[in-house]
Amino acid sequence: DLLESRGLGDVYKRQFFCWLEENAYALINGNVELRIEAIKRSCQIKARIVENDELEHGDRALLNLGHTFCHALEAVTNYSDILLHGEGVSIGCNLAFDVSARLGLCSQEVPSRVRNHYKSINIATDISQINGFVGNTERIYDLMAQDKKVVNGVIRFILASDIGKAMVQENVSKDLIIEVLQDSLER
């Protein structure tokens, strides 16, 4: 899936993200050869990560960039067709980069670049773009606190210091997450 490919580019390979940026127009307009190449590359990246970390103790967790946000958004929309999984991952990746910048893990240019790339190919970047969305930030946060990545009551976020450089971050304040969610609702 092309949206999952973009997520892999965000989290694991800056070179792949740059390739996706360069080929965005052709990919979105159906260039079959490039789509096959994008999916092939993303599968190779994912397979390499899973092979090296079968039990998700290291780099494999980084494949979940955006997924903590995504799973909560899917739940709050009752897993309906108003939010496809790939769209949720896209919005979640953008939220993760926003949190990363606010924590000072990356410069503000990084989430701006990711958001601009997604927008250039008409992929959702914010909660406000979910048609018919009815929810609030507290409910989204509560659902995030139930995610499988919660350990001993602490949400483990996959955040980024740059495109292609992700890390696990714990103890991110609820207030910061609520603020980022609210901004995404209002954008």
Where are the regions a protein language model picked out?
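Internal alpha/beta core interface subdomains
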Residues: 13-17
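Active-site segments that bind and position negatively charged phosphate/pyrophosphate groups
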Residues: 22-138
